[in-house]
């Protein structure tokens, strides 16, 4: 599909800003000790490699991607409810709807919503 490359790139970056309890996030982790670049370094590396400016408003992009992920998890929750979920992780994913939506709303408010 065609879309804004920054939407895809920011989807990668949400791992840096959400806690480990939510979708295996890195928020709060000692990135340096883990050998993982900071979010700022990652943005700089992407921008340099792609020959573009980095994202202008990450908070909006984080809100978009987290709401999107919450909606996907809501669909999984429906399949769990209906007994049609195939994944062994479906219940875990379904339980993340509200925390993901809350995180998304937090970023939306930071971005000016």
Where are these regions (language model features)?
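Activation segment
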Residues: 1-3
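Active-site activation/catalytic loop segments of kinase-like enzymes and analogous catalytic loops
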Residues: 6-50, 65-83
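Short, hydrophobic secondary-structure boundary micro-motifs
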Residues: 22-25, 55-56, 89
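All-alpha amphipathic helical-bundle segments outside canonical DNA-binding/catalytic cores
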Residues: 53-65
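Regulatory N- and C-terminal appendages and interdomain linkers associated
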Residues: 71-113
């Amino acid at each position: 599909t065609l879309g804004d490359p920054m939407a895809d790139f920011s989807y990668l970056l949400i791992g840096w800003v959400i806690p480990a309890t939510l979708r295996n996030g890195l928020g709060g982790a000692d990135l340096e000790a883990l050998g993982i670049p900071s979010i700022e370094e990652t943005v700089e590396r992407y921008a340099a490699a792609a020959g573009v400016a980095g994202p202008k408003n990450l908070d909006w992009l984080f809100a978009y991607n987290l709401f999107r992920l919450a909606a996907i998890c809501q669909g999984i929750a429906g399949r769990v409810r209906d007994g049609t979920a195939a994944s062994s992780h479906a219940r875990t994913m379904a339980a993340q709807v509200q925390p993901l939506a809350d995180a998304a709303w937090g970023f939306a408010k930071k971005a000016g919503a």
